[in-house]
């Protein structure tokens, strides 16, 4: 156990989050080429491991602010192209997050959990999931707009049957989201998005948790077991079980 003062703890946390160390090309700001800016954003995603998505936008959406705070004046178009250019996918980490495609195997435990659970809080989908999946296979990615809309009422969570079916398949790994258009999720087959070397569920639940605990600790730099667990919404017991390996 190390004794760390408050100032040192703050610096460790800020450094680990990428808020003390400027990217070597960040000073170029908007003068950097679009390709370089996209590469900067992808490198940032790789270092952070996950970037949370949120519908709320004041100055900008949260996934854009993450890049601005660490990379400076990169273009919004470069951020969007990097996140939705085929090198990342969207799944449940801390919340709905953008994740590098290389992390697909690490969330096998969560996909298995959803499959075993058998339903979301909405219940089992009443829409024909097989027909939806076949349509995506034949026609390519679709959004809820292509299947009648996402909602069947005024309430935020009052989803349509098609939306429930798409989200259930997303949870279970039958579909993947690697792009948004007009902020709508575009659902596709994972085998068309995730590179073959990462497209597997071979890791055990314990192996998944061990890798995500390490990733969470690296991102936090310093923190309690509960804080490290919350990076990827793991049980605190998972952090305690793998603490000796950190």
Where are these regions (language model features)?
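Long, low-complexity intrinsically disordered regions
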Residues: 1-246
